[in-house]
Amino acid sequence: MTVREAGVLAIGAGPANLALAVAIEESGSAELADGTLLLEQSPDVKWQRDLLMPWARSQVSFLKDLVTLRNPSSRFTFLNFLHEQGRLDEFINLGTFHPYRWEFSDYLQWVAASLKRVRIQYGARAARVDPVLAEDGSVSGWSVLLTDGDEIRCRDLVVGGGRDPRVPEVFAGLPADRLIHSAQYRTRIAGIARDEPVRAVVVGGAQSAAEMFYALHENLPQSRVTMLVRSIGLQNYQTSKFVNELFFPSFVDEFHDSPAEVRAQVLDEMRLTNYAGLAPPFLDELYTMLYRQKALGPQRSEVRAMTEVVGARVEDGDVVLDLRDRLSGKTEPLRCDLVLLGTGYDPRKPALVRELAARVGIDKVEVSRAHRVRLGDAARGAVYLQGVNEETHGIADSLISVLANRSHDILADLLARRAGTGAGSAR
């Protein structure tokens, strides 16, 4: 086992921590940049690794990349990536603000490879985080134990690995080999023979569920696929330009300063902008596919709306789902081989963060405007949380839209604390 030191240790090398890495590298503080390390459990950087279908597109403008809204002249922009790849003319000719998901993922890997001072360690998974205490009992830093037994000690910790997948309780008793969450889709589907006549059921009514439903027809062409939607039917997410202003980085201040009950109401109203709808062009393509099946055959697929799963078990080698029709109230069984969950992510803070909070005696994790966990004025070491603060920073907190500006907020707080000037923007 080896013990190493870092000034800033960031868990995860996804978009959030890469945006911060770019901000740190461009900060002018060589000491801060040289002392920053990102840990990535995978062998490379991939964005939404298990939903990188060749036809899937980003739902966010390429101008909301890791840096443009903070520093449009940066060498780390998506447009500079295209220029260096020799595809800028062709991309402009596409006439779209929404690149393919694989292309944005390639951009992230390019950014990671282009960092000069900030380091990334691949194949490194954090197993546990413990506080390092000063003589007076205050938190002076953090000890991060990796799964390979190595330890990294740091002053400041940034957690940006995203939320944990949500598996509804009704499915908890199903064997792991019969259940696939969208976070595992491509990896798990690759292990099934392409010609297998699988009876698959997709649960969920938003983008990830619909993408799995669509992709199954290509990945398993002999499959029969049923999609279960609890709502009245699949629908577009809200695309109004007026509503989209709620994704402006400037809205974060207004949201953060509002009373908790107001924030909860706004989040509920904004649900259809992100969590409960589909991109309009993709929704049209999905409906067209089902129409072609009905007209030309074979009809392998169906979408069942106003249907909820109230029971799940294995019986005689089949997975049996008990489905309740919300209109009639009747319940009937549906037999299948495989259940795919587009059920999103656990709204709680990630397990790693909850465990860390327990070790420092925090019952409820609260963060400042600069995304720093409130540990008390005596703490020298800090923890910053990225992408899991919707209840205080708005629904865009989990999205790419605010990455560039959020990285500025965290950077300003890091620099202010090192300069001894207080909390910076961390009110």
Task: Cite the ranges covered by each PLM segment.
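A conserved beta-strand/loop capping segment in the N-terminal third of enzymes
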Residues: L69-R101
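Generic low-complexity, intrinsically disordered sequence content enriched
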Residues: I24, W55-A56, V67-S73, L220, ...
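Short, solvent-exposed beta-strand-terminating loops
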Residues: S58-F76, L234-Y237
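Flavin (primarily FAD) cofactor-binding/catalytic cores of flavoenzymes
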Residues: M1-P43, F91-Q207, E211-R427
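Glycine-rich phosphate-binding loop and adjoining beta1-alpha1-beta2 segment
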Residues: K46-D65, V243-L246, L278
